Amino acid sequence: MQLTHVLVVGLLVLTSFQPINAVTNRVDCSAPEDKSEPGYWCGLEPLCCYSGKCFVICFGSKPAGT
């Protein structure tokens, strides 16, 4: 029963396409070393950087060596 609730909440988060402010504040994904381009991941989080913001949905692949 709890697993279903977690999945529903997860789907709501994934479909929201909203920046995660907590992660954006913690990870500066606009830094040059993070390659602020679609498809690049924000630090160790499974989030992508789009225009300097960390998003839940990642349309690209994680860069090699990170």
Curated annotation (Swiss-Prot):
Q: Does the keyword Disulfide bond apply?
A: yes
* First-listed, main subcellular location of the protein, grouped into a coarse class: secreted
Q: What the record says about its domains?
A: The cysteine framework is VI/VII (C-C-CC-C-C).
**Which organism does this record belong to?**
Californiconus californicus (California cone)
TM stretches of this protein: none
Instruction: Provide a GO CC annotation, any one.
Output: extracellular region
What tissue specificity is annotated for this entry? Expressed by the venom duct.
Q: Which cysteines are joined by disulfide bonds?
A: C29-C49, C42-C54, C48-C58
Function summary: Probable neurotoxin.
Q: Name one GO molecular function term.
A: toxin activity
Query: Which UniProt key words apply to this protein?
Result: Disulfide bond, Knottin, Neurotoxin, Secreted, Signal, Toxin
Q: What's the name of the protein? A: Conotoxin Cal6.21
Q: Where in the cell is it found?
A: Secreted
Q: Where is the signal peptide?
A: 1-22
Statement: the UniProt record of this protein carries the keyword Iron: no
Q: Say which domain of life the source belongs to.
A: Eukaryota
